Curated annotation (Swiss-Prot):
Keywords associated with the record: Capsid protein, Helical capsid protein, Host cytoplasm, Host Golgi apparatus, Host nucleus, Ribonucleoprotein, RNA-binding, Viral nucleoprotein, Virion
Protein encoded by which gene: N
GO molecular function: RNA binding
Lineage of origin: Viruses, Riboviria, Orthornavirae, Negarnaviricota, Polyploviricotina
Organism domain of life: Viruses
Residues at which RNA binds: 29, 32, 66, 104-105, 184, 194, 197, 204
Protein known as: Nucleoprotein
Organism encoding this protein: Punta toro phlebovirus
Length: 243
């Protein structure tokens, strides 16, 4: 039997729906899926999910993404709140599967609120607002979290897209060196390569439409109604290029 005949014959093989469905689950993408994160949050959170999400975002912004470690240095009231959230949402600290929730996934799924909240807690972030201002005057606070990448609209004019991305990278370099000291002696390109893949994945995500992203960027003051970047964004991008 020729290979062609084998291929033709194989086309008549039966398709068992239940078996195929099982394979789909087994092979499902294990990375970040914002829709799945939101579905899990709503399912596990009940009526209070919105308030809980705000708590978890502030927690992630100010204390990181590992609940089991952060509670070691926290008030009794804070510990109780964190432990309640961990139990309620089944929060994981590392190596999550598709149906696991982490603080970082929640901040990314709700990036619009995360980036607004960054302004309010700027002095409690790993890299503070004052620290960024020392590098680039009036640095955009909304860019001061990795989740901002999920709001960048790649359908903006090329020069605007580039300015916004480079301005965000300026923060990401400082953030990466702060949370990973081993990067501090590396070149700009080497540090960028450490966060470039997840950043590009967030930018390329189809979760938010171009229109939604632009609306959020306007709300955050990153671009105006004419799609022009703010002066602080342009300045930050210029500093990034000069590194």
């Amino acid at each position: 039997m020729s290979y062609e005949e084998i291929a033709v014959q194989f086309a008549s093989e039966s398709i068992d729906e239940q078996t195929v469905a099982g394979w789909v689950t087994d092979f499902a993408y294990q990375g970040f899926d914002a829709k799945r994160v939101i579905a899990l949050v709503k399912d596990r959170g009940g009526e209070d999910w919105k308030q809980d999400v705000k708590k978890m975002i502030v927690l992630s912004l100010t204390r990181g993404n590992k609940p089991n470690k952060m509670i070691l240095k926290m008030s009794d009231k804070g510990k109780a709140m964190v432990n309640e959230l961990v139990l309620k949402y089944k929060l994981k600290s590392g190596n999550p599967s598709r149906d696991d929730l982490t603080l970082s996934r929640i901040t990314a799924a709700f990036a619009g609120w995360t980036c607004q909240a960054a302004d309010y807690v700027q002095e409690y972030l790993p890299v503070t607002g004052r620290a960024m201002d020392a590098i680039s005057s009036s640095y955009p606070r909304a860019m001061m979290h990795p989740s901002f990448a999920g709001l960048i609209d790649q359908e903006l004019p090329a020069d605007v897209f580039s300015e916004i991305t480079q301005a965000h990278c300026l923060f990401m370099i400082q953030f990466s060196k702060t949370i990973n000291p081993s990067l501090r002696g590396l070149s700009k390109d080497e540090i960028v390569s450490s966060f470039e893949r997840p950043m590009q994945a967030a930018i390329s995500s189809t979760f938010l439409t171009s229109a939604n992203r632009r609306a959020m960027l306007k709300t955050l003051g990153i671009i105006n109604d004419n799609l022009k970047p703010s002066s602080s964004t342009v300045s930050a991008a210029k500093v990034f290029r000069s590194l």
